[in-house]
Amino acid sequence: MKTKEDMQELYFPTPKLIEWENGVRQYSTVRGDTEVLMSYVPPHTNVEPHQHKEVQIGMVVSGELMMTVGDVTRKMTALESAYIAPPHVPHGARNDTDQEVIAIDIKRLKADETYTSPEDYFLDIFKTRDLLPGMEVTFFVEDWVEIMLAKIPGNGGEMPFHKHRNEQIGICIGGGYDMTVEGCTVEMKFGTAYFCEPREDHGAINRSEKESKSINIFFPPRYNRAKAKKMKADE
């Protein structure tokens, strides 16, 4: 029988610190086929091009980064775009600024998934709307994945408990809120990640006075399925 600690480690894995010779620090959390990396890139630091069998998607949370995927280089500013590096496609980054950059990268390899990307490997904002009254969300969409930036209002703003057929991962990137997965509740703070498999019950509430922010990833897309289906049909 699983203990409360076992359940918490399943849904909210303890981050493991990875330190690289160039000074980059990464906090890694893993469930199943997916790894979330919260990366801290020092000023004037290069991350040399590399490749691997997993697909990798990423977004800048703070600062700006020159990101290269394949032969395409683009300046990424905080929460304005995302990249997709398909399996075995080289990718690297460069922080040309005087400030530390914080970025989130997600690596995944699942046997039944096909990892497409735009021709230039970068996703721009698809749309911004209110998901619930007072809860603004912004979407980035590819046919197999959907990224949703969410703002949860303070003083009791909540995402009611629900479940769905999609796998869902979330990372707190501002403020804090209580996140519950299958009855296991954790106080989310900057960098905390949760993993929710299909049909696992989950919900969130922000009990603080300040708005909280999170990045949520759905496999496959949940809220923009029509766009994802059209993208697949156009391939």
Swiss-Prot record:
Catalysed reactions, semicolon-separated: 3-[(4R)-4-hydroxycyclohexa-1,5-dien-1-yl]-2-oxopropanoate = 3-[(1E,4R)-4-hydroxycyclohex-2-en-1-ylidene]pyruvate
Cupin type-2 domain: residues covered: 41-106, 151-216
Localization annotation: Cytoplasm
UniProt xrefs under CDD domains: cupin_BacB_C, cupin_BacB_N
Cofactors demanded by this protein: Fe(2+); Co(2+)
Amino-acid positions noted as binding a divalent metal cation 2 in the UniProt annotation, renumbered to this chain: H162, H164, Q168, H202
Alphabetically ordered keywords of this record: Antibiotic biosynthesis, Cobalt, Cytoplasm, Iron, Isomerase, Metal-binding
Signal peptide: none
EC numbers for this chain: 5.3.3.19
Induction data: The compound guanosine 5'-diphosphate 3'-diphosphate (ppGpp) is essential for the transcription of the bacABCDEF operon and BacG, and GTP regulates the transcription of both this operon and ywfH via the CodY-mediated regulation system.
Annotated positions binding substrate: Y223
Bilayer-crossing regions: none
Any single Gene Ontology cellular-component annotation: cytoplasm
Annotated metabolic or biological route of this protein: Antibiotic biosynthesis; bacilysin biosynthesis
Disulfide bonds: none
Coiled coil: none
Cited InterPro entries: Bacilysin_H2HPP_isomerase (IPR052535), Cupin_2 (IPR013096), RmlC-like_jellyroll (IPR014710), RmlC_Cupin_sf (IPR011051)
Binding-site residues for a divalent metal cation 1, renumbered to this chain: H50, H52, Q56, H91
Pfam families hit by this protein: Cupin_2
Domain of life assignment: Bacteria
GO biological process per UniProt: antibiotic biosynthetic process
Oligomer and partners: Monomer.
Cited function: Part of the bacABCDEF operon responsible for the biosynthesis of the nonribosomally synthesized dipeptide antibiotic bacilysin, composed of L-alanine and L-anticapsin. Bacilysin is an irreversible inactivator of the glutaminase domain of glucosamine synthetase. BacB catalyzes the allylic isomerization of the endocyclic-delta(4),delta(8)-7R-dihydro-hydroxyphenylpyruvate (en-H2HPP) to generate a mixture of 3E,7R- and 3Z, 7R-olefins (E/Z ration of 3/1) of the exocyclic-delta(3),delta(5)-dihydro-hydroxyphenylpyruvate (ex-H2HPP).
Protein name per Swiss-Prot or TrEMBL: H2HPP isomerase
Native organism: Bacillus subtilis (strain 168)
Gene (UniProt): bacB
